[in-house]
Amino acid sequence: MNFWKIFFASFAAIIVATIVSTFLLISMGVASLATFGLSEMHNTKNSVLCIDFAEDIFGSPQHSAVSSVDIMNMNYSQPLTLRQVLTAIESAATDPNIKGICIRPDGLGSVSMANLEEIRAAILKFKQSSKFVVAYADGYTQSSYYLASAADEVFLQPEGSFDWRGMALSTMFYKGLLDKFDIDVEIFRPTVCRYKSAVEPFFLTKMSDANRKQLEVLANSVWNTVCEDVAASRELKKEDVMRYAADLSISLSEDALRYGFVDRLIYEDELYNLFDSLGVERDSRGHSNDISLSEYITANSFAATTVTVNDNIALEFVDKPLMAVIYAEGDIVDGDDYVDGNIFGTSLAREIRQARLDERTKAVVVRVNSPGGSALASDVVWREMVLLQQTKPVVISMGENAASGGYYISAPADYIIANKLTMTGSI
């Protein structure tokens, strides 16, 4: 009897695995076929580049195709890297086929606030080309509006929504649940490390004073930056921008218009009429010539000047000699492997060593986006960073966060560069 249970369970697992694998292959095949003709699409004159956030935007290349699958919708969507996005916007500024940019933040892709800050800065630089930048949405979240506020004009659907209510950070606690099942958790945290709050949910039922303090500082810092940038772009007073959130003054489209957050309430067809007046042509079907960010990136093959050594290190041609770009993204863990969302200490140390020993490589940039993790793995990486810095110039570029072990592995560098929205420091 047990034999047949095991047999049918294994058979069912094989069937499911086959179906999922087939779906992935078909989806990737369709995606590949969809890229045919993109060069012709890009060559269409008088087009508008649409930043629609249909795909996730990561700080580094992803290792697995599984990360490109939306399990809920069973769709395949190739994620973009921040470098690709920034390069695309920079290229569009001098591309004679691109008349301007339209920010359409209605997609389901995700992007961190720190990456949004860099994309926003790229759009502000794009505006120096004298090409137009407009934003249109059925509704704005705080993060999407942060990007949209960089546009020359911001439009909202007449019945659209507008979320502007400040920042809040929360923590889920598990101790009550663990107690019900009579489960004890052994916590190893030095008493002086009271700001190391990652373990608090397992032995506390509410937020500690130390954690509340640091989260308040973090939230206030991020919100201050957002309001400061929005106020500067929209020519508003920062105090007013913050007060509107505190008073919950804006939720409807009319509110956003009244307080100067949007310029006009228009329908989508009116947006296309605006494109006409800005020199964007229409195709044979009467649709405005637009190209999505992912299509533009694929058509231009922005990664063509990169020689991929492995999934975590790329050698960029900067005339001659070479500059190595190493990605360190995720939790720092022990071991030797490549898995999205994790930095394996042995693997990253080997890549740093490779860049150090490679005679062609004259300088190294390490992109760090990590909250930390294993002390052992961090120390293994730190040692290789020290040896690298002794032989070649090293620059750290911090992404969304570089805290604890993430900062530890960054410390030996000659220069450390962070964004205003980067969460960094040794706790």
Where are the predicted features?
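Small-residue-centered hinge/linker elements
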Residues: 1-246, 250, 276-396, 400-427
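PDZ peptide-recognition modules
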Residues: 245-246, 252-256, 265
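Amphipathic alpha-helical
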Residues: 268-270
